[in-house]
A protein has these predicted regions:
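Active-site-proximal, structured, solvent-exposed surfaces of multi-pass membrane proteins
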Residues: 3, 8-9, 55, 633-859
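Hydrophobic alpha-helical membrane-insertion signals
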Residues: 7-79, 465-477, 481-506
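Membrane-embedded helix bundles of polyisoprenyl
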Residues: 22-26, 113, 117-131, 136-218, ...
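Active-site lumenal/periplasmic loops and adjacent helix-entry segments of GT-C-fold
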Residues: 29-132, 137-169, 193-197, 284-293
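Periplasmic/ER-lumenal interhelical loops and adjacent helix-loop junctions
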Residues: 46, 50-51, 57-59, 92, ...
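Transmembrane alpha-helical segments
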Residues: 120-128, 167-179, 207-215, 304-311, ...
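Contiguous transmembrane helix-bundle modules in multi-pass membrane proteins
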Residues: 182, 201, 322-339, 348-475, ...
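Extracytoplasmic/lumenal acceptor-recognition loop(s) of multi-pass membrane glycoenzymes
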Residues: 448-468, 483-552, 586-588, 593-619, ...
Length: 859
């Protein structure tokens, strides 16, 4: 056994080093940055904190409780968990979270980053070893250049992508085996794993694979077509094997806001220089950017030199150079052409993470550079003279970059790049002068290459920053106690009045309304906006509730922290640790019967108070719930109104940004519960004062705001600071309304009379009873989804969407048992396809094995 281990270490020492060296480096960075357990920091930055970590918490709870994988009520009033799992959580490596406590989750995920990046280095080194045919230091250097490139460092917080980057080298080596040995098994399994772990990034890989195959060096036309059938067949088979994930994921993503096709109109983003400068040594990795032309391209200066060397040497055929160059040029153009970028991103906008497919370009460039390196190593000493062509080419490209760049170049990156080229050139000169033997020369440049990329990785992670877990999760214990005490079933919804993270309520696995994620249903986002909640392209937050919408959504409890200053209509319940619990004064339910007139509900009005009035009237036959309060024109500073529709909508132009560009004043003529709502995309910040005292500040637009029980004579001032940008103009629409408390009491009573009584809630199955006074519509505060099956007294009934967003069914007069079961759309069909796919691949493997045995017998 010991001898076997020694043999493995001897035979694969550099391949193993390509894994363990990045692990040591990244763990060293973790220690320096005080990442848990070496401190309280975490690598979970940007959306890894606000989205992915909460989703992991929900997943962890499901794994530990063996709850249904299909559905979760811990976000968005309920959501297709399988669809979200396929997008964010499907990697088998993530199952490690089931072995640890929730308090260790941030630590485990930080070190899972380390593992996944190291595995990217390892698989790349494996690919380069297969190309070189030897286990040597160069595979470590080029493997690390892939795993620690600026793309990986900058976008490492997208932990769900890493398996796709990890599988790419294995997929490409699988294509080599498929074409040269007619064996597609490795290709099929590697692509299957990639598709399973993240279908979205794998889509980009699949586009790249088509280009890779078309530009591959085939022996002849016949081989091109015969291997093409194998390539297409195994590609399709890998998709069929992953269908149990792909089908639900695809059907889920098609319900999102971003599923709407809208091709960009621009022709170009920027210039060659803007892009190529991102190759320079010392460039700061990009973690996110609103500008879609931004990119991470750095993968080593030696890479550029060896790529130039590849183009220069005679030992490589001209046609092969043209093929490789065409691929790189096309990818490079794709970075700068909005239409091509739109296609690469699955016909979706890039939403702050530009050029996500750049890892494909980086690996293609590294593969080309490594071919050049192999020629250098195999060739005679005079072959290395072609490096001067590469240096001249790099010099020309640097010059063009400096000339054409329209963004400010950091000259230190230019100097660092030139200095790195000079250092490598000294090594080449010493080799050409026969001062260095080839072994010393290749070892030295590979060592320098490793130092270069490692230093950039250290700098990159320092620039990325970290997150202090103590400041974000200090209330977790108290909120967990609140949840245990009050969250009895899915009907008991509770929310944080404001979260430190956008999806913090999901982190605590509260039955909440908030959902910020790429799988948020577009129709639900639109409906929440119409009802007065804050929404974004792929989010709707618990910001903008009224007594009516709280009852409608069965919101029973609110959780406050000491810094929360928002008013609430709920009554104080108790304090637990550092948080305070408030309870809804009204009884609520998950579903209510509504009058059929609700089908005429006008939910598309821009005024959310009108939308709620019409819903309350049409569904429950009550009088007007909100009465509009007239507001005077705003006081203006460095701003002028160019148009006024007479109903609170103002078109403006501003000349500067001031805290009081626009000031609206409301003087209360009586005691009342007052609410406001305003839209203003050009509003930078808002301050709300009551009788001269500040009560709220921050991003307050696009949501209903409760201003409390305002007394007669009180003065409310809403100060808006406008943005100082290229536009310097926009629209502000402000509406004020008072709640009719008598109508609200009547409405709450009728809702309770029409309430569905929940009797059982297990995983993806709910059941309860309803007593309908007549044939009515049964409304569930659950997002409409075709995966729901509803039965009334055991008979399946047709489901409909109210306002395109909420689940409803027709219920006849009388008392009935109503049950709901959820299975993600596409799961059953996907499972059948996956089973069929695995049967086919097993048969292929058995046939291949039999064929090999037959060949051995003939010999």
């Amino acid at each position: 056994m010991t001898n076997k281990i020694k043999d493995i270490l001897k035979t694969h020492k550099y391949l193993l080093l390509s894994f363990f060296l990045p692990v040591l480096l990244l763990e060293g960075i973790a220690i320096a940055e005080k990442i848990q357990p070496f401190g309280s920091e975490s690598f979970l930055i940007v959306d890894a904190l606000h989205q992915y970590l909460p989703f992991f918490a929900d997943y962890q709870e499901k794994l530990k409780s063996m709850d249904s994988i299909f559905y979760s009520f811990h976000a968005g009033l309920g959501y297709n968990f399988l669809g979200l799992w396929a997008y964010y959580l499907a990697s088998p490596l993530n199952l490690v979270i089931a072995l640890v406590s929730k308090s260790m989750l941030t630590m485990i995920l930080s070190h899972l980053y380390v593992l996944k990046i190291a595995l990217c280095c390892f698989t790349a080194a494996f690919y380069f070893r297969k190309r070189r045919g030897k286990d040597e230091i160069s595979i470590v250097a080029f493997g690390i250049a892939y795993g620690l490139c600026s793309y990986m460092v900058g976008y490492s917080w997208n932990i769900m992508w890493m398996e796709v980057m990890m599988m790419l080298p294995l997929i490409l080596y699988g294509i080599d085996k498929l074409i040269k040995e007619h064996d597609g098994r490795l290709y099929c399994f590697a692509l299957f794993i990639s598709l399973w772990c993240n279908f979205y990034m794998s889509y980009m890989t699949c586009l790249f694979l088509i280009l890779w195959y078309l530009l591959y060096s085939h022996k002849n036309v016949k081989e091109f077509f015969t291997n093409g059938f194998r390539f297409a067949g195994y590609s399709l088979l890998s998709g069929v094997m992953a269908a149990v994930v792909l089908l639900p994921a695809y059907l889920g993503i098609m319900q999102t806001s971003s599923a709407k096709l809208q091709f960009p109109k621009e022709l170009w983003y920027g210039t060659f220089g803007n892009l190529f400068s991102r190759h320079f040594l010392g460039t700061t990795p990009l973690t996110m950017a609103v500008d879609d032309s931004k990119i991470n391209l750095y993968c080593g200066i030696l890479t550029l030199l060896m790529a130039g060397f590849y183009l220069a040497v005679r030992e490589i055929r001209l046609i092969d150079k043209i093929r490789r160059l065409l691929l790189l040029v096309f990818l490079f153009f794709s970075f700068n052409m909005p239409v091509l970028g739109y296609v690469w991103h699955g016909f979706h906008d890039q939403y702050g993470i530009p050029n996500r497919f750049a890892f494909l370009y980086i690996f293609a460039l590294l593969a080309m550079a490594y071919e050049g390196y192999c020629v250098l190593v195999r060739g005679k000493r005079k072959v290395s003279l072609w490096i001067y062509f590469a240096v001249i080419l790099c010099g020309i490209l640097i010059g063009i970059t400096m000339k054409t760049s329209t963004v400010k170049l950091e000259m230190k990156t230019v100097y660092a790049t030139v200095a790195a080229i000079a250092v490598y050139m000294i090594c080449f000169a010493l080799y050409q002068k026969k001062i260095f033997r080839k072994k010393i020369f290749t070892t030295l440049i590979c060592f320098l290459f490793i130092v270069e990329t490692a230093a950039m990785a250290v700098m990159g992670f320092q620039k990325n920053g970290t997150v202090d877990t103590d400041s974000y999760f200090q209330d977790t214990k108290a909120i967990t106690e609140v949840k245990k005490e009050y969250q009895k079933n899915v009907e008991t919804r509770m929310e944080l009045i404001s979260g430190r993270m956008l999806d913090e309520s999901i982190w605590h696995t509260l039955n909440g309304m908030t959902l910020f994620g790429s799988t948020a249903q577009g129709n639900v986002v639109d409906m929440m906006d119409q009802l007065g909640f804050y929404t974004g392209v792929n989010e709707y937050l618990y910001e903008g509730a009224t007594p009516f919408t709280n009852n409608l959504m069965s919101m029973k409890y609110q959780i406050y922290r000491p810094y929360d200053t928002k008013y609430t209509e709920f009554s104080l319940k108790e304090s637990v640790g550092n948080v305070t619990v408030y309870k809804n004064p009204y009884r609520t339910a998950l579903a209510y019967t509504m009058d059929d007139l609700v089908q005429t509900w006008d939910y598309e009005d821009y005024n959310p108070f009108y939308v709620q009035n019409d819903l309350a009237t049409s569904a429950f036959d009550v009088d007007e719930l909100f009465h509009m309060v007239k507001t005077a024109k705003p006081q203006l500073n460095d701003c002028k109104i160019t148009s006024d529709n007479g109903d609170g909508e103002y078109v403006f132009e501003n000349t500067s940004a001031r805290p009081d560009n626009m000031v609206f004043t409301i003087r209360s003529t009586k005691t009342r519960q007052l609410y406001i709502h305003f839209d203003g995309s050009q509003v930078e910040n808002t301050v709300i004062e009551k009788n001269g005292e500040q009560v709220l500040t921050g991003r307050l637009d696009s949501q209903i705001i409760y201003l409390g029980n305002v007394q007669k004579g009180d003065e409310i001032r809403i100060k808006m600071q406008l943005k100082q940008d290229n536009e310097m103009s926009g629209v502000v629409r402000l509406t004020a309304a008072e709640l009719d408390e008598e109508v609200m009491e009547e409405l709450a009573q009728r809702m309770q009379e029409n309430a569905w009584k929940l009797t059982s809630a297990k995983g993806n199955h709910l059941s309860g009873t309803i007593h309908a006074q007549e044939d009515q519509m049964l409304f569930f505060s659950i997002p409409y989804d075709k995966g729901w099956t509803v039965k009334i007294d055991g008979k399946k009934v047709k489901t409909k969407a109210l306002g395109k967003a909420f689940l409803t069914v027709k219920v006849p007069e009388g008392k009935h048992k109503v049950s709901l079961t959820y299975v993600s759309s596409g799961f059953k069909e996907g499972a059948i396809l996956s089973v069929a796919g695995f049967v086919i691949i097993i048969l292929i493997m058995l046939f291949s094995q039999r064929k090999k045995k037959a060949a051995v017998k003939e010999i």
